[in-house]
A protein has these predicted regions:
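N-terminal cysteine/histidine-rich coordination modules
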Residues: 1-54
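A general structural-boundary detector
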Residues: 1-4, 27-30, 59, 81, ...
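Glycine-centered loop/turn motif at secondary-structure junctions
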Residues: 18, 44, 83, 98-102
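Alpha-helical context
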Residues: 44, 48, 52-56, 70, ...
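Extended interfacial segments that mediate partner engagement and assembly in macromolecular machines
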Residues: 54-96, 105
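Short, compact, well-ordered microdomains
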Residues: 90-125, 129
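Long C-terminal interaction/binding lobes of large macromolecular proteins
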Residues: 123-149
Length: 149
């Protein structure tokens, strides 16, 4: 697994400019401390850390990628959250669909293109299941079912 966890995927290097990231307290970004984050100030890119550690949740993300990650989570989480024990199976399915090792099948390690692919795969799976699901606000043009309709 070590060989696939590059400095970019570990949040140590900015994927936009190639500079080393800086470890700071998240209060500099959010006004409240949620723990440490890695940041590239030049690119306004940052990523949080696992609770109580300085291990990043993935790659640094600029505004576009942060939005893409939120959107991917919005759809993927609807596949497993109704039944929490499905999380591992959902991520194993996603790993197979993306053709990447399970160990790096994390939205936090994804780029914009991969986040969009994850959202698309999750939407397809939700439609396949025939369940109502909530759409992301900017996806209003999608012809998909909205929860409660």
């Amino acid at each position: 697994m070590e060989e696939v966890l590059t400095p970019i995927l570990l949040g140590k290097v900015c994927p936009y400019c190639g500079k080393d990231s800086e470890l700071i307290d998240s209060s500099e970004i959010y006004g409240t401390s949620y723990g440490p984050i890695y940041i590239c100030r030049d690119c306004d890119a940052y990523v949080g850390c696992y609770n109580g550690t300085t291990n990043s949740l993935g790659r640094l993300a600029n505004k576009e990628l942060r939005e893409a990650k939120k959107r991917a989570h919005h759809y993927l989480d609807q596949l497993w959250k109704p039944n929490r024990n499905k999380r591992y199976r959902t991520y194993s399915w996603l790993s197979e669909k993306l053709g990447i090792p399970r160990e790096i099948t994390h939205i936090g390690m994804s780029d914009v293109e991969q986040c969009n692919r994850i959202a698309g795969l999750a939407i397809e799976k939700l439609k396949e299941r025939g369940v109502d699901f909530e759409i992301w606000p900017s996806d209003d043009s999608l012809l998909i079912k909205k929860k409660g309709e």
